[in-house]
């Protein structure tokens, strides 16, 4: 086949290396975005996808590498408010979440990770002062956390200890925190909520939303498509609900905090105002639904 563009040639060369296994590659699961330690061939399975909270696609497990992703995908950026930038991959890859870059006078924090880290992203973040640390909400968003740490001088990556068994690439950059709260910087605190995963975490930014406070909830507390309510799930794709006890624990973790705005896990999943009261009412609605309140509605 004749290649007419340089990009097609680069893609063909990348495919050839991937298929022949001539170099050790750190393979990435195409379904969940998790990167595995370098190996001659793709892993036989992805435990993250085999768990009931995720899934193996109908066409089966498939794998890629960071090098291949850099050819076929790119990252885009969105300024949400002063000091907060969303970073997401186009076209959509794996789960499709976006990361958040939080810029503060005390230092910058990357909240959650996406699989693709490219030159444009590194340049943007370095231009804004680099990273003080990375913090991740739960195992579905661990992705290429080691690559992100290395790109910014081996910054620490903070994960809740309750989810330690899900780490696929053990590394010195990983720092496990325990308990219910962990202060990353002045005014930036990790909150343990549990729910989706035992170590499910959220981030509270006291100065966000013009000083009213922001919670970055990932999919521990999911901003629904109507942006008027929250959902809480053990598995989102497989529609496995949480218990009332687990959902009330998420609400109880957040209620003592001052916040008016919530950023969930995708670009459009934002509760711009009134989020604290809406979260409170969403917890009660969930409890009522689990208890049978809507059985005859």
Predicted regions and their residues:
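Short, Lys/Arg-enriched N-terminal segments with co-localized hydrophobic residues
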Residues: 15-23
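Pre-active-site segment of Zn-dependent metallo-hydrolases
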Residues: 86-133, 171-173, 179
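Short hydrophobic/aromatic beta-strand or adjacent loop that forms the aromatic wall/cage
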Residues: 84, 97-99, 198-202
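Metallo-beta-lactamase
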Residues: 25-44, 51-55, 68-82, 107-117, 132, 146-199, 239-255, ...
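N-terminal juxtadomain amphipathic helix
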Residues: 25-92
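Active-site metal-binding motif and surrounding structural segment of the metallo-beta-lactamase
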Residues: 118-159
